[in-house]
Amino acid sequence: MLGPIRPIGRLWSSLMKSILSTKYQLEKGITIGLMTYLTKMRGGEKGPPFVGLIELWWSWLGSFCGIFACAFLSFYYQVPLLIGSFGASAVLIYAAIDSPLAQPRNLVGGHIISAMVGVTCFKLLGVTGFSCAMAVSLAILVMLLTRTLHPPGGATALIAVITPSIQPLGYYYVLAPAGVGALIMLLVALLTNNLANKRRYPRYWS
């Protein structure tokens, strides 16, 4: 009577050992994966050095002149040439001029492409949480594909969706303020950055 039961018992014991071993390996893998994931958040590299007074001066001068030029021309000609995302662009093209994200192709191309994406999302999807997320994420995707990644472009796309004063402009938003404003900022960057002996802008055009 016990003969047939013994193989079943051995099979059951082997199955339980296999399940426990798999469970252990799975838990071990999850633990290691979680620890690796959390370790990435520790950083570990040294922070950048402090900026010298001369660098502070040129960064201040460029950003002041760039934003002032857009604001002055906007008020004088009663044409929208200034949007909030230009404030973020000023940080890059006047204070982090060696960054690949600050080069002319990225500055102008990033704003124009993002403006087109933002307006399109607004026209097709209206003003919703989905359209806001789609505008920003799609703008990032297209900028990456076209080698025009410019972080302020995400804001340019979002502005097209959520700003009531911008919405009536439609695709004119791509021309002004996005396109023309970015060109004004670029012109000021070319003039001010290259006045400094140790600065050279841009690093490349294409």
Could you tell me what each predicted segment is?
Residues 82-86, 150-156:
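Transmembrane helix boundary and interhelical junction motifs in multipass membrane proteins
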Residues 98-106, 143-154:
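Membrane-helix interface "capping/anchor" motifs
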Residues 116, 120, 145, 157-160:
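Active-site beta-strand/loop microenvironment that shapes enzyme catalytic pockets
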